[in-house]
Amino acid sequence: MITSNFKTQENVSQAITLASWLAGEYSSIKYTLEDARTNPHIRIFFRPLPYDFFGGIGFYSEEIYDHDPWHPHYQFVKRVIPQGDSVRVENYALKDPDLHTGAGQDLEILATLTPDNIELRKGCAMIFKRQGDTFVGGVEPGHKCLIPRGDGSMTYLVSEVKVTQKTWTSRDTGYDVNTHEKIWGSNSGPFKFDKVQDFSGEIPDIAIL
């Protein structure tokens, strides 16, 4: 029992560590200046949500092109959950994303977001495991995180992510659900981002249970 309790505390600690590293604004400007053709200036926000939103730790996540901040590339809500020897990060879609655009930068907009505004993206949770000073994550097994294409075809998402205290690195790739052929995604390697603002002080000061 003592071992079990200790393991539970360790799992919670890992989840809180991942959350504190995630919390922030990230920018690709360093890599844009090196090669703007393959690295447009992108900013990503992981803004902590109040404890009452999930009864634990959650984030509003928004990715924008720097030149067009009011038309995000994506908007999601994420929930951080200890899971065995890993950390599960559930993904939720916004029912009306336009209502919450800018919430990564504006706390008044963030305050308009409620659990009624979101719905779970089934099969799209990310599973993170710590490897030294890095958390390495990927989409949960099963190829069930489906992304429809404009031509009516369906793809599944494979996402590769690395998180440190100061960086976010990611590559998303879409594969045909029938042939498993690569349909979309970067051909020039993962996108790299540096943390330029730290929001970890906004994470609720209550342990995940």
UniProtKB/Swiss-Prot annotation:
Molecular functions per Gene Ontology: lyase activity
InterPro entries: CpcT/CpeT, CpcT/CpeT_sf
Alphabetized UniProt keyword annotations: Lyase
Cited Pfam families: CpeT
Superkingdom of the source species: Bacteria
Record keyword Metal-binding present: no
UniProt-listed Enzyme Commission number(s): 4.-.-.-
CDD domains xref list: CpcT
Function, as annotated: Covalently attaches a chromophore to Cys residue(s) of phycobiliproteins.
Family: Belongs to the CpcT/CpeT biliprotein lyase family.
This protein's name: Chromophore lyase CpcT/CpeT 1
Originating organism: Trichodesmium erythraeum (strain IMS101)
